[in-house]
């Protein structure tokens, strides 16, 4: 998987000088899926760049063209003032659009309960990244991303409990119109709404929220019988077995990219 990651980064950056990845097969799996999506968006005409952790873009002529994957325990977004040697992300803009988006790996999102939930791969408005990097401390965004992908590089097949846990996580992250007075919610610029940008319209109910976002569980080994029973109602996309060379691998990259090109501004 790592050679494929390096190839995708080379195509986006114009040859990376170094790839600093986190330890563990599961983290490599996340990075593989993340970079495949970014590179596919590039082939479809999107303007795709790597952002350093201080928010600066990596240009082909830069001496420092490394990509850093977040290691250690999950966190929120670190302040840009902490420097450029923390986790990298991707920024992209669709053809003929003025709106930028960011692709994150392993960021903690804050829910209505006040608890945090790690999303393996998330796509959020660029404005959210700018705001969080401007803070003096590590901060989690509040709400759910436009795209949420859970990556499972494990031997056993996915269970119904795994699916329930993902649905529950998304439920806590969903900000509905009736939740404006929930005490844990932060300032408006730190929240993520389905219509932001350009608007701030909140979801009316969880069912709607799931259909105005893209939510995927990608597994190397697929799913056990009964694990996907609730996916249709909750609009969760189960994909597996996803690993290099499989039909599901190519389908996942294409389906996520199709959704982005069709649904994001």
How would you name each of these model-derived features?
Residues 1-13:
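N-terminal hydrophobic or amphipathic helices/low-complexity stretches enriched
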Residues 14, 18, 22-76, 80-84:
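Nuclease catalytic cores
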Residues 24, 28, 32, 116, ...:
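Short, well-structured alpha-helical interface segments that form or flank functional binding sites
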Residues 36, 118, 165-169:
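Alpha-helical scaffold elements adjacent to nucleotide-binding pockets in ATP/GTP-utilizing enzyme cores
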Residues 58-144, 156-157:
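Active-site metal-binding core of divalent-cation-utilizing nuclease and nuclease-like domains
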Residues 128-129, 138-237:
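Acidic, metal/cofactor-coordinating or nucleic-acid-engaging core segments within structured domains
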Residues 244-265:
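C-terminal helix of von Willebrand factor
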């Amino acid at each position: 998987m790592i050679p494929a990651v390096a190839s995708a980064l080379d195509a986006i950056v114009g040859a990376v000088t170094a790839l600093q990845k986190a330890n563990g097969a599961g983290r490599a799996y996340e990075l593989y899926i993340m970079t495949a999506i970014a590179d596919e968006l590039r082939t479809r005409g999107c303007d795709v760049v790597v952002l350093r952790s201080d928010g600066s873009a990596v240009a082909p002529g830069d001496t420092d063209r490394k990509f850093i994957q977040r290691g250690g325990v999950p966190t929120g977004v670190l302040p840009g003032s902490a420097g450029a040697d923390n986790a990298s992300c991707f920024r992209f803009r669709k053809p003929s659009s003025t709106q930028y988006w960011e692709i994150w790996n392993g960021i903690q999102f804050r829910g209505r309960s006040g608890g945090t939930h790690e999303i393996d791969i998330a796509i959020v408005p660029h404005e959210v990244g700018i705001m969080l990097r401007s803070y003096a401390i590590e901060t989690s965004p509040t709400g759910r991303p436009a795209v949420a992908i859970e990556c499972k590089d494990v031997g056993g097949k996915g269970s119904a409990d795994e699916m329930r846990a993902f649905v529950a996580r998304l439920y806590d992250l969903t900000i509905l119109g009736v939740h404006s007075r929930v005490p844990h919610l932060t300032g408006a610029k730190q929240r993520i709404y389905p219509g932001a940008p350009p608007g701030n319209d909140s979801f009316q109910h969880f069912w709607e929220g799931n259909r105005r976002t893209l939510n995927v569980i990608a597994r190397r080994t697929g799913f056990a019988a009964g694990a996907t029973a609730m996916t249709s109602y909750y609009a969760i996309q189960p994909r597996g077995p996803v690993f290099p060379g499989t039909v599901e691998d190519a389908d996942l990259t294409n389906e996520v990219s199709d959704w982005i090109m069709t649904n994001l501004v």
